Curated annotation (Swiss-Prot):
Residues annotated as binding iron-sulfur cluster: C44, C108, C110
Keywords: Iron, Iron-sulfur, Metal-binding
Organism encoding this protein: Shewanella pealeana (strain ATCC 700345 / ANG-SQ1)
GO biological process: iron-sulfur cluster assembly
GO terms of molecular function: 2 iron, 2 sulfur cluster binding; 4 iron, 4 sulfur cluster binding; iron ion binding
Pfam family, one: Fe-S_biosyn
Coiled coil: none
Gene3D superfamilies: HesB-like domain
Name of the coding gene: erpA
GO cellular-component term (any): cytosol
Name of the protein this chain belongs to: Iron-sulfur cluster insertion protein ErpA
Function of the molecule: Required for insertion of 4Fe-4S clusters for at least IspG.
Length: 116
């Protein structure tokens, strides 16, 4: 996919995140798994991000494929994530998937929750 085509997507999936998903799927030996990102109520800022592995793509789900792995977002969560990016980081504070969300007006210190 070209960079221009990626920019047109409602949510981006970085190379770092896709690479980590690929590694985890190889360890699980289950190519049917996809990384699902979702938004739920809660956290210190009102909404929080969640990540899970899921074998299913439900009707209406949005998917992005990169490096042979898929990111899946349900329609309700996608409305809060449009223009965002799912990334992965590893450092002194630990390793995690995270969302860069331009729609968030405030975020908590750890970046796991936000408000719009």
């Amino acid at each position: 996919m070209t960079e221009q085509a990626e920019d047109a997507l409602p949510i981006r999936f970085t190379d770092a995140a896709a690479s980590k998903v690929k590694t985890l799927l190889e360890e699980e030996e289950n190519d049917a798994l996809k990384l699902r990102v979702y938004v739920t109520g809660g956290g210190c800022s009102g909404f929080q991000y969640g990540f899970t592995f899921d074998e299913k793509v439900n009707e209406g789900d949005f998917t992005v494929e990169k490096q042979g792995v898929q990111l899946v977002v349900d329609p309700m969560s996608l409305q809060y994530l449009v223009g965002g990016e799912v990334d992965y980081t590893s450092g002194l504070e630990g390793s995690r998937f995270f969302v860069k969300n331009p729609n968030a007006t405030t975020t908590c210190g750890c970046g796991a929750s936000f408000s719009v």
